[in-house]
Amino acid sequence: MGPLDRHLALEERLFHAVNVDGGRLVDAAALVLSSHAFGITGGLLLAVALWARRRDARWRLVAALGLAILLSDGVGSQVLRPLVGRMRPAYALPEGAVRWIAPAANVGSLPSLHAANFFALALVGTVGWPALGPLLYAVAAGVAWSRVYVGVHWPGDVLAGALWGTLAALLALAAVRLLPRRGKGPGPAEGGAGPGAP
């Protein structure tokens, strides 16, 4: 069985409030935030930044990033989406009712994996480099907004994605704590780590 239309009236109103014509510049920004290239580039840049900044925990943090994305994206796409089976707004609503400006296949809509992955990156990045936290979460929120703006997700999809990505990151951080330490490096003050660093 394919995805079914499982949205609420309130969520549809919220969707239409975000899925508006913001003009060429807003469209361009949303398309960049929604692109796979932006996600890949952002993840790689964060991995490099943590590797360079945190000599004391670089292996654990980079491993946590990779594991968080593996859980967030893999379990989200292979388990959660088929389990929920919710249709994207571009397919659920009548033709012409959605301003659809980004490609999206007719597959499960909840959770938004873009939102999940970016919130997973944001949490691991914040643990490894707390000063980056506000920027990372601002980017994650921007990506979540963009998925509704371009017409491919419901607001509930990106909220669920944020929650799932956060949980995936917490699981990844807990898992890498089990890895053996690779020698001693600078303390938290020198490495810029917070108290929750792995």
Task: Identify the function of each model-found stretch.
Residues 36-40, 59-63, 132-137, 156:
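Short, aromatic-rich membrane-interface segments at the entry and exit
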Residues 58-127, 132:
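Membrane-interface loops
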Residues 98-198:
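Membrane-embedded catalytic cores of phosphoryl/pyrophosphoryl-handling enzymes
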Residues 32-36, 57-70, 159-162:
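Loop-to-helix transition at the N-terminal end of transmembrane alpha-helices
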Residues 46, 71, 75-80, 168-179:
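Alpha-helical membrane-inserting segments
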